[in-house]
Amino acid sequence: MLAVLGVIVAAVIVIALSIWLGKSRKRDLDRAMGKVAPDNKKTRDAKAAADARLAAEAEEAKAATAAEPAKSAESAKAEPAPAAQAEPEPAAAPKPESQPASKPTPAKPETPESVGSRLTRLKAKLAKSGNPFGKALFDILAKDNLSEADWEDVEDTLLLADVGADASAQLVDDLRTDARITGKADPAEVRATLKEKLLDLVGRDTDRRLNAEKPGAAKPSVIIMVGVNGTGKTTTAGKLARLFVAENKQVMMGAADTFRAAAADQLETWGARVNVPVVRSDKDGADPASVAFEASAKAKEANADVLIIDTAGRLQNKSNLMDELGKIRRVTEKNLPVDEVLLVLDATTGQNGMAQAKVFAEAIGITGVVLSKLDGSAKGGIVVSVQKELGVPVKLVGLGEGPDDLAPFDPEGFVDGILA
């Protein structure tokens, strides 16, 4: 709009200037001619030339005036429109000063129960377990002048308690020749005699110490846990770690049961409760021997007192089981000697567990037995039969679901419990 007004003003000025120049030149011409209009040819020619020059100048001014709006329009078209002024962005709210992330406070490790306290508590627990084995024997043997039928009842009671055929026959023979039993029965004498005979059968003088606790034990002392899935093997491994922690030993565990998805997690949970590190694979189905090898290398590097290695308990293929356990032992012994192989047996399975026990004994060779769930079994005679069949002692027993319900096997406490 301003450009158009400028063009109009310029045109008016040019026209006014042209008129003024025309009048001025006319005055000059009149002055030169003495204001007398000469009537000769020369004067007429000069006037015509002046008029022509004035007309030409007027045409030039008109042409310039007409060209000016077009030029203005072109420049207006060429000139970019002024950019709209961007509204300033609102200032960002000041960020709060970053505070360092608070680390979760690690749970305080539990303090396991001492071994002495366990033994006292577990003896009482066994006495209250209601095992009918000892009571049934005592009720028969407390009779006066036992008949042949009574002796058959004694043998049947022993067999039902899973003492085993050979051990049952041996005990009956010993009792038959004891004057305290065959004559007029004194209940106190009968009880004392029965306790003595059962202790002999269980093995009162058998060395039941774990090899890791013996003088001159290797350090780290390696314990391999074997057993059928479902016997409480992994749980027993965790409880055994607590037992060693209670004795102020530095413990490490290896999760070589890589075929049961929850086994490594379960072992880690047990380890975390007493601050025991667990070596495991991040991949399900990994080679168990590689886990055992890594665990033994790390235990050696850390100079741990004890390394407990949990293994798989699949019995679907005896050949594969033997190969797997044999390989675990061989690769572990490249780093550390294996001091102990503990077989975990469920006491409630009775004689059915004996076939399983023999498979593991053949596969890897065992040095001791852990009887789990002994409190839930009326078949306490498994202690006798497993020792007689395998030729190795029962070293540990489990009497409950509590984390400290695992203790060294005490023959006298066991016999007292079943005769209570």
UniProtKB/Swiss-Prot annotation:
It catalyses: GTP + H2O = GDP + phosphate + H(+). GTP binds at residues 227-234, 310-314, 372-375. Residues 28-118 are annotated as: Disordered. Its EC number is 3.6.5.4. Residues 28-62 have a biased composition (Basic and acidic residues). GO terms for cellular component: cytoplasm; plasma membrane. It is found in: Cell membrane; Cytoplasm. The gene is ftsY. Belongs to the GTP-binding SRP family. FtsY subfamily. One of its GO terms (molecular function) is signal recognition particle binding. NCBIfam families: ftsY. This is Signal recognition particle receptor FtsY. It comes from Bifidobacterium longum (strain NCC 2705). GO terms for biological process: SRP-dependent cotranslational protein targeting to membrane.
